[in-house]
């Protein structure tokens, strides 16, 4: 068992975005949507199968990208992540690489660096490390690489996602310097900042 599943969470309602469409469907200056940027970079990285977890809106995906509709998306990001983890468990993959579909600035190279980080298991129990991205010396943390041994420690309710695992298992976290930015698009002001970066 060694395959990696790339997961983009795209289920949330995007309630802070005041544009005419859902934030993931907002078209950026190059004609692609916010989510298309994120998905295209994940596909370009060529790490493994890509899964987009949808909910509030259906996000268009290119051929070969899988979607998983999460009907319980209103119950928080952790429930969307749990749906992805359950899917990954059924597939039998060893790792999940995770980011959000509203992060258009994470390039393929960042995905590759997180996927390619190798470190022997640590500690008396042989725990696998949790690999997170850093950008210009600041923790992203996305993409995040999670070995299946850590999946049971992830929250299954609320809005925390993988943050609580990263916080609670800090001794296992390894940062890898990456190009790009993990800034997310939550508001129209974020779009303006993204355009000027």
Task: Write out the residue ranges for each language-model feature.
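Conserved alpha/beta core of the MobA/IspD/sugar-nucleotide pyrophosphorylase nucleotidyltransferase superfamily
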Residues: 2-6, 152-197
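Conserved N-terminal catalytic core of the sugar/cofactor nucleotidyltransferase
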Residues: 34-99, 109
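N-terminal glycine-rich phosphate-binding loop and ensuing alpha1 helix
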Residues: 1-54
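A short, conserved beta-strand element in the Rossmann-like catalytic core
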Residues: 16, 60, 104-105
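Conserved beta-strand segments of alpha/beta enzyme cores
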Residues: 24, 49, 66, 172-174
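Conserved beta-loop-beta/alpha segment of the NTase-like Rossmann-fold superfamily
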Residues: 74-154
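Short beta-strand segments
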Residues: 9-11, 53, 99-101, 133-135, ...
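Short beta->alpha connector loops at strand-helix junctions that form conserved
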Residues: 29, 68-73, 176-177
